[in-house]
Amino acid sequence: MTARLALLASLLLLLQLVPPSSAVVLELHGNVYPIGHFFVTMNIGDPAKPYFLDIDTGSTLTWLQCDYPCINCNKVPHGLYKPELKYAVKCTEQRCADLYADLRKPMKCGPKNQCHYGIQYVGGSSIGVLIVDSFSLPASNGTNPTSIAFGCGYNQGKNNHNVPTPVNGILGLGRGKVTLLSQLKSQGVITKHVLGHCISSKGKGFLFFGDAKVPTSGVTWSPMNREHKHYSPRQGTLQFNSNSKPISAAPMEVIFDSGATYTYFALQPYHATLSVVKSTLSKECKFLTEVKEKDRALTVCWKGKDKIRTIDEVKKCFRSLSLKFADGDKKATLEIPPEHYLIISQEGHVCLGILDGSKEHPSLAGTNLIGGITMLDQMVIYDSERSLLGWVNYQCDRIPRSASAITSRL
């Protein structure tokens, strides 16, 4: 009896020593088209105010448009964030050094020794100052205010400032020291550097931090390139309609970027994809004819005899693509069915949601981005603890029951 009690006491002590896994789960809104954003509502400040932030695994810094005062800003939901200048990060602080390390730029101090920065994006740029304020994350007892460093963007470039934007800023979920995930882990809010998102084609979804929501089975895993600054698996080959011969001339370096609405291929794989798609249509679906779309972002579209309302109406005319990532003798396959690369436009046309990156921006030349359209109806997991990328088909419009709480499990 004494031995059993001693064993039980040892087990209880062990359970106390093992840190629990945890997860913060947030509801997602938006769609690929026509909104072009997937965003969460983040409550920031004291008192907390809601702001819509675009989830972006391709960016490290979280930032929102703010009245610093603002030089160039869009019309945003909930208005501009108004910072308290006493919360501005100084150039001498480690947070500023971490920011510039993530940006891979030499540090430049701004006025009053404040940590100013400039970020270039494919669709524009943002200049701002690093701020610290409270993020009220969902918790079982209401909210859990957490002090987070983020960007106060007061000058947005290359944007039409007269056109409202559906989001206030960006939730930086990339690989770096100033990412929201890194800060949450360093403060003990989560115990594992793991995040995942699940974007529904029905316009809903969820985002989670920590590993408590990762499925225990069924996930396809691929090792991440440890040397890459973005979430990138090993090089992959592109195949069409399950053919054994790849249509990509060489292995493709691929980046998973939830901040990209569409998927972007480098010049050769893009033209190879376009060629096989057009060839299939010319043989099997001649009723679809190529047409110029009013939306300039959609560069290749087809019209039918009548307006096309759903992808199901034309799905039989298209074939699946697949990306196969090699890991020694093993291969991890990302299936890309037609509904994960096609869009029905407001004109009632079916359009290719894979774009030529070299035409969009010089920085995308030679780059292959897996964007939101190709991640639909899948849970995509970024496990920096094990340096793995994972994906599994999932019913993303069903938010986990614990979506309003921070949950824990051993």
UniProtKB/Swiss-Prot annotation:
CDD domains: nucellin_like
Secretion signal span: 1-23
Tissue: Expressed in pollen, nucellus, ovary wall, shoot and root meristem, coleoptiles of immature seeds, and somatic embryos.
Gene Ontology MF terms: aspartic-type endopeptidase activity
Source species, domain of life: Eukaryota
EC number: 3.4.23.-
GO biological process: proteolysis
Residue positions assigned to the propeptide: 24-46
UniProt cross-references to Gene3D superfamilies, sorted A to Z: Acid Proteases
A Pfam family per the record: TAXi_C
Residue span(s) of domain Peptidase A1: 38-392
Reported function: Possesses protease activity in vitro.
Family statement: Belongs to the peptidase A1 family.
Full protein name: Aspartic proteinase Asp1
Native species: Oryza sativa subsp. indica (Rice)
Gene (UniProt): ASP1
